[in-house]
Amino acid sequence: MYIENNSLVLIIPETNSITPQLFTIHDNKPICVCSRYSLIPSKKENVQISYIDNIHMYFRSFKNLYLVNPRNHDIIKVFNFLKNYKWGGNFYLLFNV
């Protein structure tokens, strides 16, 4: 799924201890989602989401986000990424599936 510049993204972490927050993506700068994740807009249509501890999350289709082990590329977890509302740009909600 293409995420436009200045889009608002809601990330719901797996643990309840981390509060979900909104973040704005712009200028290809990394944006801290929580202590573990950062959003990095790429030059392509997709936005790459990187995990600090040797795990990467990235878009591989228009509707799904994959949490992947970078060493063997095994899919660890799949997320459903859906457009939800429009508010100052496109608003997306990341659901754990």
UniProtKB/Swiss-Prot annotation:
Major subcellular site: host cell
One GO cellular component term: host cell cytoplasm
Keyword Magnesium recorded: no
First and last residue of the signal peptide: none
Subunit record text: Part of a complex composed of A30, G7, F10 kinase, A15, D2, D3, and J1.
Function field: Late protein which is a part of a large complex required for early virion morphogenesis. This complex participates in the formation of virosomes and the incorporation of virosomal contents into nascent immature virions. A15 is required for the stability and kinase activity of F10.
Family: Belongs to the chordopoxvirinae A15 family.
Full protein name: Core protein A15 homolog
